[in-house]
Design a protein with these regions (language model features):
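Beta-propeller folds
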Residues: 2-224
């Protein structure tokens, strides 16, 4: 007669909702490059599933490799602004490190935020160029349609920066307090699923943006 001793760990409610995830270290945010040659994705570290790095799978060769290690580009604990915390929660973005990224329309470059700053990688070149390095926490970062500029929100104002020259321009300057430029207000994010407040024209010569004035909204203290 054979007997088998099962030493399985008892599954508790606390374990279900704690790290590491029970579904394993699955890739996230999979995207096919515009030229169709590779698939990029985010994947957690073996030592911490919630600390994400940027990877690629080359379709023709079958090679999988890490493009960027988030620890190499940013050291220390990531401190998010309140606006970024709320934005990530509504976009269902979890984890730390490289939590999002985007391809340029021509498939020749990648842009990704990390720790409130911005990194840019041109295919065929080594490393990532840090385009922003400030005390502020930039959010809603985008590549312009032709890939010549990045745009972002800083301190409730809209900015653009020319990648080649490094010239930065404030599109708005009056943001702050109850005034927000280029930012989706609470109702837009929560009820409409709109997470941005500005849009490039296809030829990247113009930007349409919103102005939100929350001055008429009553401030109510909520005790939790």
């Amino acid at each position: 007669m054979l007997s088998t001793a099962l030493n399985a760990e008892t599954l508790t409610i606390e374990r279900i909702f704690s790290s590491p995830s029970l579904d394993g270290n699955a890739p996230r945010a999979l995207k096919v490059s515009p030229d169709g040659e590779r698939v990029t994705f985010l994947k957690g570290k073996q030592t911490d599933y919630e600390r994400l790095d940027l990877w690629e799978y080359h379709i023709e060769s079958g090679e999988t490799r890490m493009l960027f290690d988030s620890n190499d580009l940013q050291s220390g604990e990531e401190v998010l602004s309140d606006e970024e915390k709320a934005r990530r929660e509504r976009m269902r973005l979890s984890g730390s490190g490289i939590v999002s990224y985007q391809w340029s329309d021509d498939g020749k470059a990648l842009l990704f935020p990390l720790g409130g700053d911005v990194f840019y990688h041109k295919l065929g070149e080594k490393g990532a160029k840090q385009l922003l390095d400030t005390e502020a926490f930039e959010t809603d970062i985008k590549l312009s349609p032709k890939g010549n500029y990045i745009s972002f929100i800083r301190d409730q104002n809209l900015y653009v920066k020319h990648i080649a020259s490094g010239k930065e321009t404030a599109i708005t300057k009056e943001g702050g307090g109850n005034i927000k430029f280029g930012m989706a207000e609470f109702v837009a994010q929560e009820e409409m699923g709109r997470m941005t407040g500005y849009w490039w024209s296809p030829d990247e010569s113009k930007i349409a943006f919103t102005k939100v004035d929350e001055s008429p909204v009553d401030v109510i203290t909520r005790s939790e």
